[in-house]
């Protein structure tokens, strides 16, 4: 459950470390984003040689949330951190590597490139 002002970790190698959600996409009054949802973020922390710079506004997809998400079979999944992957306008990741596990919900939302780069899909 990600809302405006939420700080997320970056789960890719674009050089961004911390992202802050500034908009949840999908309707004018949408408050929360969950796994597989696209958000607009501001880069709050980045490495010096980063692809993205501090202060840059980027689109990202949520890949891990602390809030548990119910699956259709009745099981729940939650992670230790909130994390997102920075994406281009065509839903492909801007980085070339993904760090940490990602949720299976991304497969249903057509983020196949992120699924294929991820070391583990839970």
UniProtKB/Swiss-Prot annotation:
Keywords: Ribonucleoprotein, Ribosomal protein, RNA-binding, rRNA-binding. Coiled coil: none annotated. It comes from Carboxydothermus hydrogenoformans (strain ATCC BAA-161 / DSM 6008 / Z-2901). Part of the 50S ribosomal subunit. Forms a cluster with proteins L3 and L19. In the 70S ribosome, L14 and L19 interact and together make contacts with the 16S rRNA in bridges B5 and B8. HAMAP family: Ribosomal_uL14. This is Large ribosomal subunit protein uL14. It holds the Pfam family Ribosomal_L14. Binds to 23S rRNA. Forms part of two intersubunit bridges in the 70S ribosome.
């Amino acid at each position: 459950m990600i809302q405006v002002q939420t700080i997320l970790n970056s789960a890719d190698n674009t050089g961004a470390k911390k992202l802050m959600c500034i908009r949840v996409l999908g309707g004018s009054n949408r408050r929360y984003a969950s796994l597989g949802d696209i958000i607009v973020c501001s880069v709050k922390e980045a490495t010096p040689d980063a692809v993205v710079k501090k202060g840059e506004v980027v689109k990202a997809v949520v890949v891990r949330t602390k809030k548990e998400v119910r699956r259709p079979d009745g099981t729940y999944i939650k992670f230790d951190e909130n994390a997102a992957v920075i994406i281009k306008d065509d839903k492909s990741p801007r980085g070339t590597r993904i760090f940490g596990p990602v949720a299976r919900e991304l497969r249903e939302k057509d983020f196949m490139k992120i699924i294929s780069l991820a070391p583990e899909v839970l």
